[in-house]
Amino acid sequence: MQLQADRLFSISMNYKKTAEFASQLDKQDQLSSYRDEFFIPKDENGNELIYLCGNSLGLQPKRTKAYLNQELEDWAKLGVEGHEHAKNPWMPYHEFLSESYSKIVGGKKSEVVAMNSLTVNLHLMMVSFYRPNIKRNKILIEADAFPSDIYAVNSQISHHGYEPKDTLIKLSSREGESVVRTEDIEQVIREKGDEIALIMLGGVNYYTGQVF
């Protein structure tokens, strides 16, 4: 980690807005080989596009079709028996993902499970952590959070008998800017902290790519 931090610091100190410098960084990129693992959209002339929308929808891995076809083939041949006898049995499928997921979140394999959809998981989380009362009932969220996140939050607010328009606080960027300033987030928390029951900010905003 320290080596990577030192390298990033060196890059920031020697940064140049030139094609040569960008090419040099590409050659030094230890992850560059993974580029070949994905399909990259092309323009009308067949040139690969520069894709900067991974925070919204990632590129398709080249192995995806083969993986999906394997499951469809097992379904066709095995039917319900696929739950136990497919190449990747469906019943314990989540166990195949726990180890890699644990590395991403920094937990133990026994502590991590892949389940449901994002929206369902948000509802499960808010059932536990959103406990509004008369004084403290507001939810703080990004103004441009993923639409289904907003739907889930509004649903929970209504479920507890409150009006979303009065209860949901949306963080917006300043006029002419694309990301929310940290100091603006802190200011809202200072001003509304006694009224806020839940703060829900995504790790990476799907629309702007801002990291929180």
Language-model-derived ranges and their functions:
Residues 2-212:
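Pyridoxal 5′-phosphate
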